[in-house]
Amino acid sequence: MPKFLTMIRWRWPALALIASLSLAAFAGCVSLDTQQRKWIFQASVLTTQDEGARIDGLDDVWITLPESPRKPKLHGLWLAGPTPDAPVMLYLHGARRNVESSVFRIRHMRSLGFAVLAIDYRGFGRSTDELPSEDTVNEDARAGWAWIEAKHPGRDRYIFGHSLGGAIAVRLATEVDDAKGLIVEGTFTSIPAVFQSMKWGWLPITPLITQRFDSAERIAKVKVPVLVVHGDADGLIPPTLGRALYDKARTPKRFVLVDGGTHYSTNGRGQRQYRDALRELYGLGA
């Protein structure tokens, strides 16, 4: 597929959101927040025909949120670590994806020494079908963190987020005090900054964005070591946004730029650099 068509394919939701916000600025729209949530998350629900498709080596996990009115259930995948006492990673995926389409990256993380719990937020995969928001995905991330604490007490825990999941991970890291580290890949400083990085960024729509995911403001509050990874060929989230997020973080921290890494290939291409950074920043795999 030609490069310009690939760019349009992946950025079409962003273009649609820009167009909608511009129109709403003049016409007004009571469903503006709803439309933003649909376009930003692009939630992918699995049908009943998809259910029960076991993935070799991974176990299904179900987590209930009893505090929420509907008592929603989250589906997740658990991949045991290479050793019984391996550190545990909470894996938070990005927009459009679900845990089953993230298995390749989950396995990469195990190869780096982690046991991994990956969760689907409400509205994704087999989790309760509900339109996600910035607040509900945060609740879901906290539920996943609590599950790890309950099921694997005493083990070191790390938070990982890819793309939009990186913003969810940053927020979670500001709200828990028992993480050993925060790792984000292919992520950004804020949703407004993503739009401003595009050729249409001059449009005056920033005040209309309700799902802001302001990681740049939050990451300065993160007290654990931070690893920021980005591919230098990422055509969806510019590496400059990953670097800007890194610049806002406290020390100790590390920025890794993976040569030739795209938004989806960076994790695989950067395994050696990941190992080096994990050893230097967290003492893992030493």
What are these regions (language model features)?
Residues A24-P66:
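An N-terminal hydrophobic leader/cap segment in hydrolases
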Residues S68-W147:
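Membrane-embedded segments
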Residues R105, S215, V224, P238-D247, ...:
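Short alpha-helix in the alpha/beta-hydrolase fold that links the catalytic acid
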Residues H152-S163:
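Alpha/beta-hydrolase fold nucleophile elbow
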Residues A167-V224, G268, R272:
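Hydrolase active-site cap/lid region
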Residues K221-K223, V228-H230, D234:
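Short beta-strand/loop motif that positions the catalytic acidic residue
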Residues A233-I237, H263-S265:
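Acidic catalytic loop of the alpha/beta-hydrolase fold
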Residues R243-Y264:
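Catalytic histidine neighborhood in serine/cysteine hydrolases
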